[in-house]
Design a protein with these regions (language model features):
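Hydrolases whose catalytic domains are alpha/beta-hydrolase-1, hotdog thioesterase
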Residues: 27, 73-77
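Short alpha-helix in the alpha/beta-hydrolase fold that links the catalytic acid
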Residues: 29-30, 158, 169-181
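Gly/Ala-rich beta-loop-alpha elbow adjacent to hydrolase catalytic centers
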Residues: 64-74
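Flexible "cap/lid" loop of the alpha/beta hydrolase fold
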Residues: 80-111, 133-138, 144-149
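Catalytic histidine-centered segment of alpha/beta-hydrolase-like enzymes
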Residues: 170, 185-203
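Short beta-strand/loop motif that positions the catalytic acidic residue
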Residues: 162-168
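Active-site catalytic motif of lipid deacylating hydrolases and related acyltransferases
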Residues: 1-59, 190
């Protein structure tokens, strides 16, 4: 796993963002941090990361925002948050009932190609928006797909805010509804960040 500080200005509050598969900061770089520091974790080829999590203890308030596969991965780290938001993901993200159906996921790995990756990114949106320019290596993204099959969420972790898009073509909306037991509350595709201008809107 990798990390990157998106805003590090010595604020008393920090937003911890667990990104989705294959992504970098391009999907959320437009969000204003306001009076919060922001750190992003991404690239789940391994869960080992060269980061001292005790650094986060200096913040008086820690907020979690996780998206897609990051919803599961965030639960695997022992961090106490003031609030936690799950966006278009579940704790069973590769699952016939609660996530991406297993057969579809395996077929995605088997047939993964640069063209397939580009189609995936396009399918994250349900409207004509400028697609993010993700600067991740193809082979790294491909191996990350396989690595994610090896992880299981900490089911004791509790999210207190759930955001579900009504037209998610990646993790089917109906499967998210089945997992969380709430109706969709965002009018978008899998990547909803273009609906927002500030991180605080996601807390």
């Amino acid at each position: 796993m990798k990390y990157r500080w998106l805003n590090e200005k010595g604020n008393s509050k920090v937003i911890v963002f667990f990104n989705g598969w294959g992504m970098d900061e391009s999907v959320i770089s437009h969000l204003e941090p306001e009076n919060c520091d922001v750190i992003m974790f991404y690239d789940y080829n391994t869960l080992d990361v060269d980061f001292d999590f005790s650094v986060l203890n200096k913040y008086s308030q820690k907020y979690l925002v996780s998206w897609s596969m990051g919803v599961m991965c965030a639960t695997l780290f022992d961090i106490e948050y003031k609030s936690s938001t799950a966006i278009n993901g579940t704790l069973s993200p590769i699952d016939d009932k609660f996530g991406i159906p297993k057969r579809i996921y395996d077929l995605t790995i088997r047939g993964f190609s640069p063209a397939g990756r580009d189609k995936f990114i396009k399918n994250m949106f349900d409207t004509e928006v400028e697609l993010p320019s993700v600067k991740r290596e193809f082979e790294e993204q491909k191996s990350e797909l396989s690595a994610l099959k090896n992880y299981s969420a900490n089911t004791d972790f509790k999210y207190n805010k759930i955001l579900i898009s009504n037209n998610d073509k990646i993790i089917p909306t109906k499967n998210q509804v089945a997992f969380w037991g709430i109706e969709p509350n965002l009018d978008s595709g899998h990547c909803p960040f273009y609906l927002f201008t500030k991180w605080s809107e996601l807390l």
